[in-house]
Amino acid sequence: MNRADLLAIGRQTLTPPDNADPVAWCARNVTHIPDSPFKGGYRPDRWPWVGHALRIFLDPTTRVLAMPWAIQCGKTLTMRLAATYLMANDRGNMVIYMDNQENAKDFTLRYLRPIFNVVPAVRDHLSVHDNAKSDTIDFADGTIVYNNSASTSKDLQRISTRFVFGDELWKWPRSALGESMARTKAYEWTSKKLYASQPGLVGDDFHNLVEMTDRREWHFKAPCCGHLQAYDWSFIRFPESARTDTGWDHRKVEDGTTYECAKCGTRLADTNETRNKCNAEGEFVPMGVAQKKGYVGLHVNALASTSWGSLSVDMLKAKEASDSYGDESGRMIFKTKYLALPWSDDGGTMVTAATASGPPGIRP
């Protein structure tokens, strides 16, 4: 054996496997994301918290991941990518629970099968007997991906599996989450469970699960001073010119709202470019200590991805409905869907003050 052969063997030995980093693997292999607002394949720079969530979930030390995320922040994409990576690199039986069977079947046919078919490392291992119209996905080695209703007792009790994914837990009946977690008892040391949803009510099963985790919050790095900080609604600032005798001019609020850096006070412009810069070096920071080993929580609110001015108008409309008619539905929607926080019947007080001289920010 000559020197060149020895060097080739050495390089092969030292080269990390293709699947060493799940984010890099997804970027290489998921070349198209069917039914996605984004064109092309998976790009980690678009929503950086998705890549961070993938690495955290697929880390061997993570047993349970709870993701209370705002709507339109990549929750479903994260689940699709995680399932695709597992079926290519660490196959095992999986159950994906939705609030009802119709939504479960839709998830398989609309979101899961299409992305599986994009990736040869998954597609090529499907069974020849797999039915492309079925909400059950069969692999040649006997692995099965089920999609079931969390509202049906038999679907929560009849399957033993290694992986459990749960979506839209705010719609699940009481105790369904615990039943789904019990499906992995036979695989306790190699199992993983991922639960993703907008929050529901304080004290419901999903909220209690999140409270058991280390409650990591998505933090951004301010481009003005480099300070790492969480997206906090109290640092939203309305322009003084938007104030009127009766309240706020919604159009001026939408056009002129900014975000104040928690450290240096710089007003960050409400643009996608600003948010991209902020998120580029962001990370999840633990806000507590998990009550069980391997229990991780990841929280993302809409400030990370959505126009601050647009969100501010939504908040003002919700406050006006609450103040004028006692209608709390808008506040509940804003808090659970956009701030990704659980709702309680008392609701708290919604305060608006968003100028440099006024009290800090807006609290729903």
Label every PLM stretch briefly:
Residues M1-P364:
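Phosphate/NTP-binding elements of NTP-utilizing enzymes
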